[in-house]
Amino acid sequence: MKNYYLVDEKRKTPVSTWEKISQTFRRSVKLELFVGLFVMMRELLKRNNSATIKYPFEKVKLDNRYRAVHRLMRFIESENERCIGCGLCEKICISNCIRMETSLDENGRKKVGNYSINLGRCIYCGFCAEVCPELAIVHGTEYENAAEQRSYFGYKQDFLTPIDKLKNQVEFEGAGSLRKDADLLVVKTPNYYDVMIERALENQDTQEQGENK
């Protein structure tokens, strides 16, 4: 068995009432107490040294990787929805709070008819944004989503970027987005080199034809 010992063997455990009162008094008038009071008063009397902000008139600037209420993105050029209805976000959701209904349009392409997220159940883990192949669902910076009901659902029209505000849509840089040097990290396949050789030969032929003329 191990031999246990006290950290301070010289200190005796108070037994009588007077010893307990004496121990409490000694601990109360130690130097550490006055040091803490001095630091508190010094910070209190400083000007323009407030540790708080005047919410809601002032708000903390959020980082790009902050995970708040979701957003559904559009393509700026065509104004079409990025979501292809693959259902990966619904399958990977560990809170089981995403529901998606898809159907086929007149061209035989899959379209998303209904899309809902139970914001009261969501834990904002970011898995849905990371698994999305089209960067269609991302996390925004809207965190003021208090509701009176426990099950608070957000629907497709609540998350999707309106067309009139599409010009103000900013690409998401948080969870699920590509790195700025993503192109440099892509491993080039043999087909890439074949294409580059063909392009070089075509450029060479074009230059030779121009010189012959």
Swiss-Prot record:
[4Fe-4S] cluster 1 binds at residues 83, 86, 89, 132. GO terms for molecular function: 4 iron, 4 sulfur cluster binding; iron ion binding; NADH:ubiquinone reductase (non-electrogenic) activity; quinone binding. Binds 2 [4Fe-4S] clusters per subunit. It is a peripheral membrane protein. Its EC number is 7.1.1.-. Residues 74-103, 113-142 form the 4Fe-4S ferredoxin-type domain. SUPFAM superfamilies: 4Fe-4S ferredoxins. Its cofactor is [4Fe-4S] cluster. It comes from the Bacteria. Keywords: 4Fe-4S, Cell inner membrane, Cell membrane, Iron, Iron-sulfur, Membrane, Metal-binding, NAD, Quinone, Repeat, Translocase, Ubiquinone. [4Fe-4S] cluster 2 binds at residues 93, 122, 125, 128. One of its GO terms (biological process) is aerobic respiration. It catalyses: a quinone + NADH + 5 H(+)(in) = a quinol + NAD(+) + 4 H(+)(out). One of its GO terms (cellular component) is plasma membrane. NDH-1 shuttles electrons from NADH, via FMN and iron-sulfur (Fe-S) centers, to quinones in the respiratory chain. The immediate electron acceptor for the enzyme in this species is believed to be ubiquinone. Couples the redox reaction to proton translocation (for every two electrons transferred, four hydrogen ions are translocated across the cytoplasmic membrane), and thus conserves the redox energy in a proton gradient. PANTHER family: NADH DEHYDROGENASE [UBIQUINONE] IRON-SULFUR PROTEIN 8, MITOCHONDRIAL, NADH DEHYDROGENASE UBIQUINONE IRON-SULFUR PROTEIN 8, MITOCHONDRIAL. HAMAP family: NDH1_NuoI (MF_01351). Belongs to the complex I 23 kDa subunit family. This is NADH-quinone oxidoreductase subunit I. The lineage of its organism: Bacteria, Pseudomonadati, Campylobacterota, Epsilonproteobacteria, Campylobacterales.
